[in-house]
Amino acid sequence: MQYTVLIPLFIFIGAMVLFGFSFQKKQPQRRIVQILFLAYCVDFLALIIAVMMLTFLSYDDLMLGVLIPVLILSIIMFFVMIIAHYPLMKRLFGH
């Protein structure tokens, strides 16, 4: 039961891997946007699961040691994804 707290960590790592795929060369812009959207969704899923586990499960050192960094890194990664591909997003969505 105590290792269920690793689930958000692995989901977050999956979001980071997807974000890394968005930097591959010679990809069409549409493909980059699809990868980024999937990375946003996976990152948000890790954030939601971590918040739910912190809210509804009892606390121990492993849980706090894994879930709090996942929460912080997930929020930071959300903004990093926006900033890293800002020129592409600005060109696609205008303004």
UniProtKB/Swiss-Prot annotation:
Signal peptide: none annotated. Keywords: Cell membrane, Membrane, Transmembrane, Transmembrane helix. The keyword Nucleotidyltransferase does not apply. One of its GO terms (cellular component) is plasma membrane. It comes from the Bacteria. The chain crosses the membrane at residues 3-23, 35-55, 63-83. It is a multi-pass membrane protein. It is found in: Cell membrane. This is Uncharacterized protein MG131 homolog. It comes from Mycoplasma pneumoniae (strain ATCC 29342 / M129 / Subtype 1) (Mycoplasmoides pneumoniae). The lineage of its organism: Bacteria, Bacillati, Mycoplasmatota, Mycoplasmoidales, Mycoplasmoidaceae.
